Amino acid sequence: MAGPARWKLLTALWTIYLVWGSTYFAIKISVRTLPAFFSAGTRFLLAGALLALILAVTGRSMRISRRELLSSALLGISLLGLGVGGVTLAETRIDSSTAAMIAGTVPLQVIALRTLARERVALATRLSVFVGLAGLALVVLPGGDGSRSAVGLALAVGASISWSLGSFFGHRLPLPRDGFVATTWEMLGAGAFLVVLGVAGGELGTIDPAGFSLESVAAWLYLAVFGSLIAFTAYAWLLRNAPISKVVTHQYVNPLVAIILGAALLDEQLSLATGLGAALIIGSVFVAVRKEGAKPSAPDVLPASPQSIREDAPFERDAPRRSAAR
């Protein structure tokens, strides 16, 4: 039986490259006039509601046990609430390309967690972690141009740590077998969490629809529909139809896309040190995913996101749920 047409594979692959790579740019545009937690929370509520509608139309039940609901909510809060929500807040203070570079270290952080847990990790993979974290230091340390920048960098690093912890512990939780159902509940749980955070942080009093720019609203819709639904669907399809070694290439391509968009459309500048840091991060992630993706039984390294159906994907066992919501 012939496999899927090459054009389908390339279309799906470039969809996750470009869409997930552009989410950092879209977040930067959205928070120009939309409150950070409000925009992220409502985005996930909308995406979760649309996914629930799709499940209903296709006859798939969203009924799950209480344990699965609690696990889905906790994972959603870790990956999307604190992870993506933290990045969204960070981008009110730092460039989108900087946020993308920091988020790009998540696969390396998960490998570090696996090493600490005494899982078998190849020497080259472990060395790539040290190289990548050195790159992260170059990205973060030159950014001390005031307290706002320092706060933004700290938020982005904290968000990446939350995402890494969720990625590492996620497959140990009792989650629904259907990755789409799990993703739906994760989005809804994270959305509710972020809206509550926004209310507690006083965002409700700052919301003025008349002040929302068309660009910010369009970016918000793009994140909900393209970032969380269309790219998610392409990713889930790739996990079933493409070699995992090809699918995981998005982990080093996405930061590259984010850096290019930030420079071309937002006039974001990279210093020599930051550029070197970006090269070290992307290069080390390239080495890590190539080494891990080549192993038929390797544990998952990450996300995704995002966010999403990893029963048949040993390298990204829970990626569909994680990566979809970026």
Regions found by a protein language model. Name each.
Residues 1-2, 43-44, 141, 216, ...:
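C-terminal-most transmembrane helix of multi-pass membrane proteins
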Residues 4-10, 33-37, 41, 64-70, ...:
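Juxtamembrane helix-entry segments on the extracytoplasmic side of multipass membrane proteins
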Residues 8-9, 33-82, 107-113, 162-166, ...:
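Transmembrane alpha-helices of multi-pass small-molecule transport proteins
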Residues 19, 23-26, 52-103, 138, ...:
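Specific transmembrane alpha-helical segments of multi-pass solute transporters/efflux pumps
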Residues 30, 39, 43, 90, ...:
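Hydrophobic/aromatic residues within transmembrane alpha-helices
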Residues 40-42, 80, 99-105, 169-192, ...:
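Helix-helix packing/entry segments at the starts of transmembrane helices
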Residues 51, 75, 105, 121-142, ...:
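Hydrophobic transmembrane alpha-helices of multi-pass small-molecule transport proteins
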Residues 51, 109-112, 116, 146-205, ...:
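Transmembrane alpha-helical segments that form core, pore/gating elements
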